[in-house]
């Protein structure tokens, strides 16, 4: 088995279509329900169907962890402990990713939970990239992380409520900006859409 090297600390965030995401060799699924761990430390992990939930992860010098936090009443009431468990899951954190949530009346706890997690990441981690508040009513995001390559793979979808079919949501920088209410890319991160890098000069408003 190859020994995993420390990450470069310039993480790649790569938005890919669902067809590519579904074929990836993914292990260590992080689920949102209370019957399974919602925070997981591993070299590879992934999570799916983040809608009004908050997802993401933390990368340290020698370890990484991911999370998927449901916006239910129990998590809302226990968010302080949840945040502590997330921030303590990795020693010497270098970068973090926070994604998801919806700013809608049907999910009143979604943005408060997201905001508290985002603020905690900003306090405890030097470099944080944020993809905040999915605009699409039936939008969702999946993610996977591989510490060996230090790459976050993100997949955004619109789901047809009539037949459940998936519609690709991100084809370029404009559609990415239309999918989220706010995007902020950390100085240590690089953004890619379908393998093509988006440089700060291409969209300066989203780069810190």
Q: What label would you give each PLM region?
A:
Residues 1-13, 24, 206-208:
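Non-Sec secretion/translocation targeting segments of pathogen effectors
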Residues 16-48:
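Phosphate-centric recognition/catalysis
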Residues 16-19, 106-208:
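Divalent-metal-activated hydrolytic enzyme cores
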Residues 42-89:
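Conserved mixed alpha/beta catalytic, RNA-binding, or beta-rich assembly cores of soluble enzyme
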Residues 71-72, 100-104:
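Acidic, glycine-rich active-site loops and adjacent beta-strand->loop/helix elements
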Residues 87-92, 122-126:
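Secondary-structure boundary elements
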Residues 92-100:
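Short glycine-rich phosphate-binding loop at a beta-alpha junction
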